[in-house]
Amino acid sequence: MYSQTHQGQHVLMNGGQAHQRFGMQIPKFQSQGHHHPAQQPHHHAHHNQATHNITHQHNFSSGALAAATPHFTPSHMQNGAHANVDEDIDESMNEHWQQQLQLAAESRQASSPHYYARAVAQQTKGIQIAPSQPDGQENGTDNRNGTVKTKSKPRQGWHALDFGGQGLRALSTSLFNYVFLEKLYLNHNKLKALPQTIGQLRKLEHLDLSGNDLTELPEEIGMLTSLKKLYLFDNNIRTLPYEMGYLYRLDTLGIEGNPLNDILKSQIMKEGTKALIRYLREEMPVHLPPPDRDWVILDDTSSSTEKVTVLSHNALCDSSATSSHFGYTPSRALSWEFRRELILSELRSHDSDIVCLQEVDQGSYNGFFREQLAYNDYKGVYWPRGRAMGMQEEEAKNVDGCATFFKGSKFILLDKQMINFGQTAVRRPDAKGQDDIYNRLWQKDHIAVVVFLENRLTGSRFIVVNAHLYWDPAFKDVKLIQTAILMEEITKLSDGYAKWPPCTDKTAFRFSEAEGGGESENQPEPAPSMEYASGDQIPLFMCGDFNSSPGSAAYNLIANGRLTEEHPDLEKRLYGNLSRVGMTHPFKLKSAYGSIGELSFTNYTPDFKDILDYIWYTSNTLHVSALLGEVDKDYLQKVPGFPNFHFPSDHIALFAEFSVKGKKGKVVEADFGPQRS
């Protein structure tokens, strides 16, 4: 078992690496269901790496290995191979190759059964390790070594397995169900192949496969993006899969004792592990794209019903797409010039009536998307985030914001508005004396863009909201209040839109705005503008990156229409009436993908996979008829995260088709004149 109490205190007796304790005398595996690693739900932060919990992995003591020279080359190894050191390479004695030889020597000393488990057990004699005992004793407070064990919620109690020196020729697939494992020792066996299911162990930080008969590694090895140590000493490996380029956290790759090809060997000898991994990543070929996402038809109604398609996508702006955030992505796939073309291609292929993009900077909107999408009959509305105000023009180009596009031949733009959550909050009458509004909310410059559209042909009107909320999980209260302010402002706008005058001359709008006016001869006469009795009767789409998972406070407020003032996400902070009397809104909103139980994810990276993006709609005015489905599951077995060559952002696009329900507005009765009784 692992224990955190004495980490770093137990150097292995043979001079090997310092370990956290684990024991092999375990009556049964403990359930992984209690293992809840902390994750950060957004790409701006979830790539921060944790610091090492132990000292340098290979601290040599004054024991036998301390006297071993870098040229330690035993005449015979377990698999019959001999040390493969090119003495004629001048660089062979640099620091990188010296480390290889040192680690290889250590590995060859560890060929006995359960070497690492036994060494740790020997080192920890007299120190109480969390004992195997009935569950009822787990929360005891008395420890034999005199320390006091604090009560805590159940957790995974061990994280390492040592199957070293067992003569294993194959591995049971059940081994790879222990996805909580952080260390796995399979060294000095007789394995000739590694199962593809190794890719399931995505928490592995240390994997030792030394002293086997491996000739290759599966592509799925690239899924182990938490790996820091990968030991392959003394196998028969000649080449490495390009997918190892995904292992951006790998510090040490042990390959001495393998007939590795000259190009790869030269990279690691001269420049070390990081350089080799970078080489594999940058030289990675573009694999076949996944199958197209299924178009899931939910309601195959008559084509005569008014239909509207809506697409929402967080595009991942250039300033956020850094190699420090996305170290697993090849630089050419991370470049904005490449990714923007992928985004544009997807938008054109779906040809949605309405498109909502988040994280689009001003330069990309004005210099690329607006120009390119104009060829596809799109008109756009854009606002940058609040920080752009007061900046020099050139600097402001890099500030991202929200861009909403709509088909100019189908819709008339009646109004457009921008909601700055922080500025709106401080203008509220009840904001006075509420420090949290100023200290936590006002400093965040996130926005929503609102457009009010009318269908030229049918007269139906639509409110389209495009929002991007704050990401940090430590600011749940901020996300909740941003959502509450968003709903308040939409309520006010919708009430005004219900009183909006009708369009009196749609033909003029059509000829002046629509491309290819000559086609208008075949268009039916447009219907009059539809009237609505109240704001909540106008069809509403609310799209965006809400940075909130299903079941969160922000999600529940949108879905349920109300939230208590005592919600724990508020953390007893003061936000005026919003924290005193609670939050409400009048709309009957549903998530479009709620019809299929939501997608598996909308944001996909090695450390985070969750649902953050939504297309909300008012269920009293609209009905979901079709959706763009999941990303192919088989494709994801070899892809640890987005963006990549096929997906331009860490978020995926949401795309849905809606049917407009029957009119809910004012009913105008026809006058047939005097009637006979």
UniProtKB/Swiss-Prot annotation:
SMART domains: LRR_TYP. Residues 30-49, 128-155 are annotated as: Disordered. Keywords: Cytoplasm, Exonuclease, Hydrolase, Leucine-rich repeat, Magnesium, Metal-binding, Nuclease, Nucleus, Repeat, RNA-binding, Transcription, Transcription regulation. Residues 128-149 have a biased composition (Polar residues). It catalyses: Exonucleolytic cleavage of poly(A) to 5'-AMP. It is found in: Cytoplasm; Nucleus. Its EC number is 3.1.13.4. It comes from the Eukaryota. The keyword Electron transport does not apply. Its cofactor is Mg(2+). CDD domains: Deadenylase_CCR4 (cd09097). GO terms for cellular component: CCR4-NOT core complex; Cdc73/Paf1 complex; P-body. Residues 33-49 have a biased composition (Basic residues). GO terms for biological process: DNA replication; DNA replication checkpoint signaling; nuclear-transcribed mRNA poly(A) tail shortening; positive regulation of transcription elongation by RNA polymerase II; transcription elongation by RNA polymerase II; traversing start control point of mitotic cell cycle. LRR repeats lie at residues 180-201, 203-224, 226-247, 249-270. InterPro entries: CCR4/nocturin_mRNA_transcr (IPR050410), Endo/exonu/phosph_ase_sf (IPR036691), Endo/exonuclease/phosphatase (IPR005135), Leu-rich_rpt (IPR001611), Leu-rich_rpt_typical-subtyp (IPR003591), LRR_dom_sf (IPR032675), LRR_R13L4/SHOC2-like (IPR055414). PANTHER family: CARBON CATABOLITE REPRESSOR PROTEIN 4, POLY(A)-SPECIFIC RIBONUCLEASE. This is CCR4-Not complex 3'-5'-exoribonuclease subunit Ccr4. It comes from Aspergillus terreus (strain NIH 2624 / FGSC A1156). The lineage of its organism: Eukaryota, Fungi, Dikarya, Ascomycota, Pezizomycotina. The gene is ccr4.
